[in-house]
Structure formats: C-alpha cells, structure tokens
C-alpha cells in the first residue's frame, strides 16, 4: 500500500534528524553535516560488523563493514560504513536534484512533540512533522 510505504519512508528519514535527540539519539546524526538531501536510512550493527542502507526515489545504496571471523570492530571502524555511504550517495547527487516521494492523499502530516509523542505546542522543545493515515493522526 503506497500510503504505508510513504509513512515508512518518512519514518526512516528520521535517522539523521536532530528533532529526536531529546529522548534518544538517532543513529546517523554524525552524518548530518555531510547530507544535503533527504534519505530514508536503516542501520544495523553487531560487535563484529556494521551495515547501512539508504535510499531515495532514485537510488538504493548499502555499505557493510566488518569481519567474517567475528573479531570485534572498533568504534572508528564502525563509523566507516556510514561515512563511505554518505560520501558515495552524496557524490551520486553532486549535480542532480534528489527526488523524494509524493505524499499520498490519504496521508496527513502533524507537527508532533518528539518527546511526548503528542501534538506539539509552543512549549515543545523538539518538534517534527510525522505522517499518519488520514483519521489516525493525534488530535
């Protein structure tokens, strides 16, 4: 269903958003200075490897770093996959405009307080537009 796919893509784009730092730390905030476009991003890691996949409407790219013999990666090595991914996907867009997905008619955006999960107010320190199926958004 294109409505749910749009919502999922938007959720995954929050991996590189500072709007959620109030209660958690998104996994790709270290990449924010490198990223000039909106990407849906999913990361994963174990003690011995790191994985990042990211995409737009134009491109899907993933990078894996790690060891096949279960040696632990260092913190520096664990950042390598993210940095290689960011540098490469940004190079792809060097002279191009990135396309993002068109919001379906049955999806609505609401300004949400990212700490409480409720509608944002003037007192909300961190806010983000989150997407919902029409009729399921917070009131």
What do these predicted regions represent?
Residues 1-138:
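A penicillin-recognizing enzyme superfamily signal
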């Amino acid at each position: 269903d294109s409505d749910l796919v749009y919502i999922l893509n938007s959720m995954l784009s929050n991996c590189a958003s500072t709007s959620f730092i109030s209660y958690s730390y998104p996994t790709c905030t270290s990449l924010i200075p490198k990223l000039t476009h909106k990407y849906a991003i999913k990361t994963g890691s174990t003690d011995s490897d790191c994985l990042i996949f990211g995409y737009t409407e134009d491109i899907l790219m993933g990078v894996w770093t790690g060891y096949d013999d279960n040696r632990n990666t260092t913190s520096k090595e664990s950042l390598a996959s993210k940095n290689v991914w960011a540098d490469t996907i940004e190079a792809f867009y060097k002279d191009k405009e990135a396309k993002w997905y068109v919001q379906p008619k049955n999806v609505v955006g609401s300004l949400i307080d990212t700490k409480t999960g409720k509608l944002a107010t003037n007192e909300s320190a961190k806010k983000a537009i989150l997407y919902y199926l029409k009729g399921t958004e917070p009131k």
